[in-house]
Amino acid sequence: MKIALYGYGKMGKAIEAVAVARGHEVVLRVTGANAGTAPTGADVAIEFSTPDQALANMDLCLDHDVPVVVGTTGWYDKMNGVRKKVGDKKGSLLWASNFSIGVNLFFRVNRMLAGLMDTRPDYAAHIDEIHHIHKLDAPSGTAITLARDIDLKTKGYSGFELKEDNAADQTISR
């Protein structure tokens, strides 16, 4: 498979290493220096850039009929527009706040526990998230997914609040 990588930081380089080891070919590596480069010749694009660049990269891939896998978070407030474009273009887009199998199992357990918490109004959910200082998006898509799932599964909650303590420590609580 021929892959276009949008975002060539730590994650992009890790994806490239695994892809090449499995016999795939990386035909494009997009960084800030060559932003806006079309995914010509790619079978699929993998998007792990920054929230401000992700939407432009998704648009570019959809405009060139290249399916795109998106791991970048921080753009979900524009989800309706992205869904519309995918539908209008009859394109393909797969996104997740976290692609780790372990974290997705954790998401499932979180939803189960949120359902159990619904019977315990004397308890409240609270999420503290701490990352390394190089984390580009905070709070992470993972923390937002956890909070959203608790909100959806538990009566009595009507959303969640983001509290920023500092750049490396983000709190999501209710």
Residue map of PLM features:
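C-terminal substrate-binding/catalytic lobe of Rossmann-fold NAD(P)-dependent oxidoreductases
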Residues: 2, 10-39, 121-174
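Hydrophobic beta-strand scaffold residues
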Residues: 26, 68-69, 92-93
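Short, ordered loop/turn segments at secondary-structure junctions
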Residues: 32, 73-75, 98-99, 130-132
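Beta-loop-alpha module in the N-terminal Rossmann-like domain of NAD(P)-dependent dehydrogenases
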Residues: 37-61, 74-79
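Rossmann-fold NAD(P)-binding glycine/threonine-rich loop
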Residues: 59, 63, 72-95, 101-115
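Active-site-proximal catalytic alpha-helix in oxidoreductases
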Residues: 101-117, 135-148
